């Protein structure tokens, strides 16, 4: 691959809250990759881009992470991700999987809440689980397999617009995660606060942001009020294709 020898500099700004599991660091790398592609006039197949970004984070920055955040940032919108080894492919030294775009109009009303002051870096959240998984701990291995099953069921619930089922799966996701992680009390409090309003709740990623389904504007207002009382900010994310 031949690149021209013109110089460049990179400057960036972001409004993504830091260290609350909303993938702010990888979003900067994805944006930088897009700039470099345009600057050098090169193309990287879309399915390979998340793996390229992840390799920069793991190999150059030493960050423990997975492909999920990078996939949705590269594809945008809503994407079903299948990480089964049966669909694993390798091209140009990059391992990637099966990613399916879904229509964002299938989504029910969702909220996103994050803590305004407390946070935890993604690598802190993931490092212990990675070593336990690699060591073959059955509790962790079984939980990871269950997460995959929940994803398949979540896709089916979206396609059939079964929002009650989707809400139940969201709650089951968090309950499964709680069974293998030692979570800070303030993160548990965020989830339990949303659930007391009648909404579903799970982590949006790692480190202090949650996402879930709400049923009415009155419920959303209650979520906002109760989240504010524990130092958290709530928004309605806009998901476009």
Q: Over which residues does each language-model region extend?
A:
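Anion-binding (especially nucleotide phosphate/pyrophosphate-binding) glycine-rich loop
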Residues: 1-52, 56, 191
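FAD-binding core of FAD-dependent oxidoreductases
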Residues: 19-30, 64-79, 206-207
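C-terminal nucleotide
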Residues: 2-4, 13, 42, 51-64, ...
